[in-house]
Design a protein with these regions (language model features):
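Secondary-structure transition/capping motifs at alpha-helix termini
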Residues: 95, 109-111, 137-145, 218-222, ...
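Conserved catalytic neighborhood of penicillin-recognizing serine enzymes
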Residues: 141-208, 261, 273-298, 302-303
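Secondary-structure capping and boundary motifs in well-ordered enzyme cores
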Residues: 92, 119-127, 175, 179, ...
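A penicillin-recognizing enzyme superfamily signal
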Residues: 1-94, 103-104, 109-117, 127, ...
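Active-site SXXK
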Residues: 97-98, 120-149, 186, 251-255, ...
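Solvent-exposed loop/turn segments at secondary-structure junctions
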Residues: 96-97, 107-110, 122, 152-155, ...
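Mid-domain, small-residue-enriched loop/turn segments at the edges of structured enzyme/sensor domains
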Residues: 161-169, 202-250, 259, 263-266
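Structural recognition of the beta-strand scaffold that forms the well-ordered cores
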Residues: 89-93, 101-103, 146-148, 185, ...
């Protein structure tokens, strides 16, 4: 809090009036009298900042049409205004060669320097198609096989799972219908219960981690805090992994490329001033998913959009 005593060019005059030496004396003070004086100064600073943030001034704010526009509002209102803007990123990748066609990290770099394409976050239910793929390839589960929509748990010591506490996920609606769902419907309605049941059938998270690794999401990559980006925990089946939109999009592009993962390419080639090619990207591919199961999974994803089953399943 005492850091507020440090003035800047934009600090109100009442704050600037406190000399640097006097601020240092107050910070070092230990007596009760000086503490009271510090508190008085602190309260004065709080009031000064409150006044400054509540006073209308001319400033520039982001504008969707013109990029920016001048307005007269309080600094606090400008914060509220920018907080109301939808922040998102967009990336488009050609699934056949990995060429990045579009990269939009946010609204405007001048105002928002946070890149939503490279920033990491939990991916939620977008992880489910990967788990469904593993269930089919590793355990031979068929898309027509049905499972009941009831609560499922994974307990410590169960099968080859490594969770130390019981894992009892719920559906997003917190309701279980007790009805039977095949894989198509389980994915269509994004049933957490069906996903957990499939994971229990697999008996370990390692096959899922292995698939993600083939899809460019390294199972051994560690975050700055030392944790694995793809933990060895059952919760990864429901998207508890920290990856970027770039990684997720490249992984999904595999479904549109007959199960072949292609490393994203940002730069195709570089030429020197004389036109000589000094760098040319080489396509890096991995056969990640069996073509048959990839075709089934692709059909499920298309069904999620159209609501129709091309394989005539009911």
């Amino acid at each position: 809090e005492l850091a507020l005593l440090v003035a800047s060019e934009s600090t109100p005059e009442v704050i600037k009036s406190i000399s640097k030496n006097r601020r240092n004396e107050l910070i070092k003070a230990k007596s009760k009298e000086n503490f009271i004086e510090i508190k008085q100064v602190y309260n004065a600073l709080q009031q000064a900042y409150k006044t400054a943030f509540s006073t209308k001034v001319k400033l520039k704010v982001f504008d969707h049409i013109h990029g920016s526009r001048e307005v007269e509002m309080t600094p606090m209102d400008s914060i509220r205004y920018h907080a109301m803007l939808l922040q998102t990123g967009l990336i488009a990748i050609d699934p056949h060669n990995g060429y990045v066609k579009c990269w939009n990290g946010g609204l405007d770099f001048d105002y928002f320097k946070y890149d939503h394409v490279t920033s990491r976050r939990s991916i939620g239910s977008t992880a489910k198609p990967f788990l469904y793929t593993v269930a089919m390839t590793e355990k031979g589960i068929k898309p027509c096989d049905e499972f009941q929509d009831i609560p499922y748990s994974i307990l410590p010591g169960e099968a080859n799972f490594k969770n130390k506490e019981p894992w009892n996920p719920q559906n997003a609606t917190k309701i279980n219908t007790t009805l039977m769902y095949n894989l198509y419907h389980g994915l269509l309605y994004s049933k957490n219960s069906i996903t957990v049941k499939l994971l229990k059938e697999i008996g370990s998270v390692e096959p899922l981690r292995d698939l993600l690794d083939k899809l460019g999401i390294s199972k051994n990559e560690k975050l700055p805090n030392g944790r694995l980006a793809v933990p060895q925990l059952p919760s990864i089946a429901l998207g508890a992994v920290d990856i970027s939109l770039l990684q997720l999009t490249a992984a999904y592009a595999t479904f549109a490329n007959n199960g072949i993962y292609t490393v994203p390419v940002l730069i195709k080639r570089i030429k020197d001033k004389e036109g000589k090619v000094i760098y040319e990207a080489k396509q890096q591919v991995t056969k990640a998913i069996d073509p048959l199961y990839n075709a089934i999974m692709l059909d499920m994803l298309i069904n999620n959009e159209t609501g129709e089953f091309s394989m005539h399943l009911k």
